Amino acid sequence: GELARKELATQGQFPRDFKYEVQEMSAPATYIAKLVNAKGPVYGISTACSSSGKALVSASTLLDNDLADVVIAGGVDSLTQLTLNGFQSLESISKNICQPFQRDRDGINIGEGAALFVMTKNTPITNNGVMLLGSGESSDAHHMSAPVPNGMGAQASMEKALKSAKLSCGDIDYINAHGTATVKNDEMEALAIN
């Protein structure tokens, strides 16, 4: 989309092969659905850093409520000038390696990536598979780009996930923190985890 907009600005028209519909947030989901001839709900989720996790929770909800037998869920993130400009305006991009929770932290490193999961209802754990044991969500609605300082939203999400999975804090061996290496996020996340 960004290159097409540049061509529009310089040439007065979009490239011949430009298709607006592939710029839509749901375009990757629509493409995959057509590729595998999927039936049922097809949509994209955009909730910033939580989008891929939210997609897995949404897939689990579809399965749990018998709205689907099999769901392809995951996430993709492309590095665009819009993304770079956004993080630069927040002054959160590090010029060094990302060091969450470290004293000399100075921000994140951003890149591209994608992952997809095929999820089915009540699939036992096998050597080649994993199971989503539980999930938890919250919204502290504190600020568009800053978490609530006391970490209560993140803590509520983790508590809901533990309850959903029928686990206790002592059952957890690893926490995959958001870990942005920004002062506000790291302080909040440390409080929530503690």
Identify the role of each PLM range:
Residues G1-L8, D17-S58, T83-N109, A190-N194:
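Conserved catalytic cysteine-centered active-site region
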Residues M144-G151, T180-N194:
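Short glycine/threonine-rich loop-to-helix capping motif typified by GTGT followed
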Residues T47-S51, G75-T80, G136-D140, G179-A181:
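Acidic, glycine-rich active-site loops and adjacent beta-strand->loop/helix elements
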Residues I97-A165, Y174:
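Condensing-enzyme catalytic core mediating Claisen C-C bond formation in acyl metabolism
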Residues Y43-S46, V71-V76, G129-S135, G170-A177:
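Beta-strand segments within the central parallel beta-sheet cores of soluble alpha/beta enzyme folds
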Residues I32, S52, A59, F87, ...:
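Conserved small-residue
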